[in-house]
């Protein structure tokens, strides 16, 4: 592990002042898992808060966070704190009375941590590992275990953390910890904390399905995600979905989607993963036996309302200026379109793809639809029977040929062009620009000159239909 010089220098000064600075939590865990940490947490023993602040001020700007208990942030990736005592003081995962106590023992300080793998400390100067709860043993066994059965349930967020750690590290949650999690009331958790753990589960895990199925096993779904709970045991036609029910299909789809997003910016990664997770939310309400077969007709449209409810619960709107919410809803509504277009590929005109690009980003739709198509890999079904994305590959190639994979075409004709032609401001300008844009989507207008020519035809028709000619501001309209 490459420990930053800033951390080493702080540890040296703390040592010289009679204290001890120890790395703790995720950075130690990551090193033991052969991962380079991105964030660093340092716990300082034997130094009182005023003296610690004086020490830290030597190493740059210090941002003090917390009222009852102080965390000193030095930049985006280094937190320094004192060991602390916590006492539950009410309902809610943040309802604790917290007191910093630099004289605590390491064993007492680490009792408050969630899992044994996060309760390992390291001296950055001597490389000594301090492991009071056998976290290294659990790391080696790929086991997630609660540090303290007595206090684990005091922080309800730990249930979601258990699922996301299990997904990210592909660990098992040991049985006692499962039993600790299942009865915990999660209604105190705010949306931003729920999403914080779900975001890690969906984006940081290579197989998010592991974490999602742990949410089921830990009894989280009926409390927080009834839309996901509703997918369990919803049947599917074996010919199309040999993998099993809609829940199993959703887990497989999410894993296939996760494989497709590493080249995307963060907001679009979130969009694809949420759309993959929500894409069949309409099936519980639409699935029925029709002519002896299981059908889920119009489940795409039927999934819009539960998707909105799901996004509302997580408070998902825009991320970094990107309208994740609108895109997810559109992707759910249109996730079958690539396959439908492929089936009618000899009839589908360019305008259909251009118009679809106005509703959602076709590159993202391709990824969601492909994940949906490939999310059918039952172990007993030969690969060639399910690994087929011919329709989706055709769809994205055609979208790229039309240059609409990322966005719909920008309009060629704007209102200012009509004003330049002599029209007076008014609602007719919007009507004409819209009509010309529809021609553009159909490929009938490809340049500004052609757009102006078509606009003149519309204006001429307006003039001819007008008894007194007042709809045309002046004759100059037709001469430009």
Predicted feature residues:
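Catalytic cores of the polymerase beta-like nucleotidyltransferase superfamily
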Residues: 1-463, 468-470, 477-480
């Amino acid at each position: 592990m490459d420990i930053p010089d800033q951390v080493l220098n702080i540890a040296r000064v703390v040592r010289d002042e009679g204290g001890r600075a120890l790395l703790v939590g995720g950075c130690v865990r990551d090193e033991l898992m052969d991962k380079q940490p991105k964030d660093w947490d340092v716990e300082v023993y034997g130094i009182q808060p005023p003296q610690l602040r004086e020490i830290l001020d030597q190493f740059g700007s210090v941002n003090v966070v917390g009222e009852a208990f102080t965390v000193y942030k030095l930049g985006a990736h280094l937190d320094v704190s004192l060991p602390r005592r916590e006492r539950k003081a009410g309902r809610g995962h943040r309802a604790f009375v917290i007191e910093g106590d630099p004289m605590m023992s390491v064993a007492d300080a680490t009792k408050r941590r969630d899992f044994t793998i996060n309760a390992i400390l390291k001296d950055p100067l001597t490389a000594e590992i301090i492991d009071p709860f056998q976290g290294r043993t659990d790391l080696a066994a790929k086991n997630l275990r609660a540090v303290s059965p007595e206090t684990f349930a005091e922080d309800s967020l730990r249930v979601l953390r258990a699922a996301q750690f299990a997904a990210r590290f592909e660990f098992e949650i040991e049985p006692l910890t499962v039993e600790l999690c299942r009865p915990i009331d999660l209604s105190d958790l705010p949306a931003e904390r729920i999403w914080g753990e779900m975001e890690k589960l969906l984006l940081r895990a290579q197989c998010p399905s592991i974490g999602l199925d742990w949410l089921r096993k830990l009894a989280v779904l009926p409390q927080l995600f009834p839309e996901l709970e509703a997918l369990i045991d919803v049947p599917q036609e074996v010919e199309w979905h040999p993998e099993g029910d809609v829940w199993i299909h959703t887990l497989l789809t999410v894993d296939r989607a996760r494989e497709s997003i590493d080249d995307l910016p963060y907001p679009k990664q979130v969009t694809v993963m949420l759309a993959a997770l929500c894409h069949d939310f309409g099936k519980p309400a639409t699935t029925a036996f029709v002519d002896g077969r299981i059908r889920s007709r119009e489940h795409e449209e039927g999934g819009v309302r539960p998707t909105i409810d799901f996004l509302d619960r997580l408070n998902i709107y825009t991320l970094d200026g990107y309208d994740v919410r609108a895109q997810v809803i559109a992707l759910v509504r249109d996730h079958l379109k690539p396959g439908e277009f492929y089936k009618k590929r000899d009839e589908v005109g360019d305008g259909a793809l251009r118009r679809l690009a106005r509703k959602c980003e076709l590159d993202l739709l391709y990824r969601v639809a492909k994940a949906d198509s490939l999310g059918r890999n039952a172990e007993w079904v030969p690969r060639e029977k399910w690994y087929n994305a011919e329709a989706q590959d055709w769809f994205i190639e055609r979208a790229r040929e039309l240059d609409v994979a990322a966005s719909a075409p920008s309009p060629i004709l704007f209102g200012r062009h009509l004003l330049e032609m002599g029209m007076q401001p008014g609602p007719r300008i919007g009507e004409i620009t819209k009509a010309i844009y529809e021609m553009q989507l159909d490929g009938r207008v490809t340049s500004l000159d052609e757009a102006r020519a078509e606009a003149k035809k519309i204006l001429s028709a307006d003039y001819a239909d007008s008894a007194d000619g007042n709809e045309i501001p002046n004759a100059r309209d037709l001469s430009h």
